[in-house]
């Protein structure tokens, strides 16, 4: 669903209106965890809670970014981002737009991102990759994984070290990992449930676990977004 709009954005206050109606926007830092029950009433996409619904976007969609200097381009890249709100883990691999450094300097949190004069996302975070800046265009990405899950415990994201692989909440050299996983035939009944996130430059892994027993293991395309705006 695209949002038909007459968008008004105040760069000084960050206030956004569509058709004269104020839009609620809360942008999270990459990986941020918050506890605020009032946010449950809003739509949540990776890195943002808002009162509007963003459409699904495909790789290659051409978008315009609201800046004082202007900015536009195609979403030819993707990146992974997430936040946790009231124990709800909201994550996804979303389209991203490569932007030059001089445009990044003019970006404003919450500024509209449009496609054919319709609101499709908001400026939320950027990622430095291979000498370029990627601006994520957060939404439910068409043809790629996004979602949410309730979780009781979550550790901080960890880098997958060279020569290691992941099982459950741990990473080990591959041969050791195979033996470790083989020993975990079933979880202890009283074991705590948890969620773990691991990443490298190109991939993100999410595991859902009961103790050290792995219940589910997802491999998703990266990179993991690592920069908000200061």
UniProtKB/Swiss-Prot annotation:
Its EC number is 3.1.-.-. InterPro entries: Poxin_vir (IPR006853). It comes from the Viruses. The keyword Hydrolase applies. The keyword Nuclease applies. The record marks 88, 219 as: Substrate binding. Keywords: Hydrolase, Nuclease. It catalyses: 2',3'-cGAMP + H2O = Gp(2'-5')Ap(3') + H(+). GO terms for molecular function: 2',3'-cyclic GMP-AMP binding; nuclease activity. Signal peptide: none annotated. The active site is at residues 43, 174, 178. It is an enzyme of class 3 (hydrolase). Pfam families: Baculo_p26 (PF04766). Homodimer. Nuclease that cleaves host 2',3'-cGAMP. Belongs to the poxin family. The substrate binding site is formed by the N-terminus of a monomer and the C-terminus of the opposite monomer. This is Poxin. It comes from Orgyia pseudotsugata multicapsid polyhedrosis virus (OpMNPV).
């Amino acid at each position: 669903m695209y949002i038909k709009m007459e968008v008004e954005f105040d760069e000084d206050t960050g206030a956004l209106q569509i058709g004269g109606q104020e839009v609620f926007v809360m942008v999270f830092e990459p990986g941020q965890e918050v506890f605020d029950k009032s946010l449950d009433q809003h739509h949540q996409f990776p890195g943002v809670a808002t009162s509007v619904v963003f459409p699904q976007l495909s790789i290659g969609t051409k978008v315009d970014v609201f800046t004082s200097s202007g900015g536009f381009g195609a979403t030819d890249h993707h990146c992974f981002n997430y936040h946790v709100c009231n124990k709800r883990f909201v994550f996804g691999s979303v389209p991203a737009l490569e932007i030059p450094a001089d445009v990044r300097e003019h970006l404003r949190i919450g500024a509209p991102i449009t496609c054919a004069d319709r609101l499709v996302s908001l400026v939320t975070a950027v990622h430095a990759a291979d000498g370029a800046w990627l601006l994520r265009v957060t939404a439910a990405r068409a043809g790629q994984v996004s979602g949410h899950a309730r979780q009781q415990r979550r550790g901080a994201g960890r880098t997958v070290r060279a020569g290691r692989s992941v099982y459950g909440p741990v990473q080990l050299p591959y041969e050791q990992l195979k033996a470790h996983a083989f020993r975990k035939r079933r979880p202890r009944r009283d074991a705590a449930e948890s969620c773990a996130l691991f990443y490298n430059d190109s991939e993100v892994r999410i595991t859902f676990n009961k103790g050290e027993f792995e219940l589910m293991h997802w491999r998703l395309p990266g990179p993991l977004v690592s920069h908000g705006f200061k």
